[in-house]
A protein has these predicted regions:
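Hydrophobic anchor at the start of a short beta-strand
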Residues: 4, 25-27, 208-211, 309-316
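Active-site/ligand-binding neighborhood in enzyme catalytic cores
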Residues: 105-207
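Mid-domain catalytic core of redox enzymes
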Residues: 23, 198-289, 336, 387-391
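Glycine-rich FAD pyrophosphate-binding loop
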Residues: 21-44
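Conserved Rossmann-like nucleotide-cofactor binding loop
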Residues: 12, 35, 215
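Conserved flavin/dinucleotide-binding core of flavoenzymes
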Residues: 262, 268-391
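N-terminal Rossmann-like FAD-binding beta1-loop-alpha1 element of flavoenzymes
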Residues: 2-29
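Dinucleotide-binding Rossmann-like beta1-alpha1 core, especially the glycine-rich loop
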Residues: 45-131, 135-136
Length: 391
């Protein structure tokens, strides 16, 4: 069996490496950075912050896959209190009543691929409630107008990520690097050769799995068709001195922003007496990151009293095309760039043709790519289709 080369050591690359090695393949993984993890890397202490808001969903196949391999680190559940909502220029403890009722009325319905979420939801619960529901999805899309996305695309993560009871979100203690380290250990135990600090400028010999960001894959493969819609958002990572009464989460039902105080569930992420906050605001078309940052800071002003005077550390990031796939009406995950690129080249990542929500897309595409690559390496060509997960 030929050796499989994997380019990229993020969640998709590590999943592909583990899955390929479990099938008996010889695997070599190449990562350009000094550390594995990609966008799942956490910064080192004293402030262990992820690249944008991250959470695992305990109702996901990715969660089950990690658990079956003992790759789930200790994790925290979200607090049951401390959620606030920004609505009509006020910070509230309860959401807009219409939106809450709308969510209950929509439960159990199958959202269509052909319609945008705003049109579909409005036909069942009215325009105002539909708009409020759509704006709650800023954290899931990093998009300035979630309501224009496909109803089928938006409704599933809304139900699973925000409307499930009890909440399905889980937070790895110590940040996402805890997951990355366990996956690295599993790969090494399976005999995967890992080379970090190795930048790839030419496509390696097939079979190869390209598990990079889509823009990097486009350059490496020389294939300009490798594009898809993604989010555009500014993210502020802040450390502030503790103050009693700070909320855990702020859901912005006006401008699709989001604030999360991660130390509410995992105090180890910041030094004692400090809180680690991540806040994000989607950037509107034609808007600068500076203007979006100002809007985000106004949200912080409303929700975290005196945060500017309490600030001890700050990092600003602009995430453009790096937050996963977004599907417009009449498009589904099947229309995204295909995993199988032909001639023993396969693609994995969170913007390719694989089902799931958020990080599940990277995982499911990597599992599919590994099956195809192992079959190619063994000289069997293309295997019969096997569904990685159901949608």
């Amino acid at each position: 069996m030929d050796q499989i080369t994997i380019v990229g050591g993020g969640l998709a690359g590590l999943t592909a490496a583990i899955s390929s090695a479990e099938q008996g393949a010889s695997v070599r993984l190449l990562e350009a950075h000094a550390d594995l993890g990609g966008r799942a890397r956490s910064t080192p202490a004293p402030y262990k912050v992820n690249l944008g808001p991250h959470a695992l969903l305990s109702n996901s196949p990715f969660w089950l896959w990690l658990g079956e391999r003992d790759l789930l680190p200790p994790h925290a559940r979200p607090p049951l209190s401390g959620v606030r909502f920004r609505w009509r220029d006020d910070i509230r403890r309860v959401p807009a009543v219409g939106a809450a009722v709308a969510a209950l009325r929509l439960r159990g319905r199958t959202a269509p691929v052909e319609l945008d979420f705003r049109t579909w939801a409005s036909s069942h619960v009215g325009a105002e409630a539909a708009e409020t529901l759509a704006r709650s999805a800023g954290i899931l899309t990093y998009h300035h107008d979630p309501g224009e996305l496909s109803a089928a695309f938006l409704w599933e993560p809304l139900v699973r990520g925000l409307l499930s009871a009890p909440p399905s979100a889980r937070f790895p203690i110590g940040g996402w690097s805890a997951i990355v380290e366990r996956m690295r250990g599993r790969a090494v135990a399976l005999g995967v050769e890992i080379e970090t600090g190795t930048r790839v400028s030419e496509l390696p010999r097939a079979p190869v799995i390209v598990a990079t960001e889509l823009a990097d894959a486009r350059a490496l493969l020389g294939d300009h068709s490798l594009t898809w819609l993604s989010g555009h958002s500014v993210c502020l990572d802040l450390a502030i001195r503790h103050r009693r009464g700070d909320p855990f989460v702020v859901v912005d039902l006006q401008e699709t922003g989001w604030i999360e105080r991660y130390t509410a569930s995992d105090p180890s992420l910041a030094p004692a007496g400090e809180e680690l906050i991540q806040a994000q605001m989607p950037i509107r078309p034609g808007e600068s990151a500076a203007v979006a940052t100002t809007r985000l800071e106004r949200l912080l002003d409303a929700a975290f009293a005196g945060w500017r005077e309490r600030e001890t550390w700050r990092r600003r990031q602009v995430m453009d095309g790096r937050t996963g796939a977004l599907d417009l009406p009449r498009k589904s995950w099947r229309d995204r760039p295909a995993v199988d690129r032909g001639e023993g080249v396969f693609l994995a990542g969170d913007m390719v043709a694989a089902p799931g929500c958020l990080s599940e897309i990277a995982w499911s595409s990597a599992v599919q790519a590994s099956r195809l690559a192992v079959s190619w390496a063994a000289g069997r060509g293309r295997p019969a289709p096997v569904g990685a997960v159901s949608r």
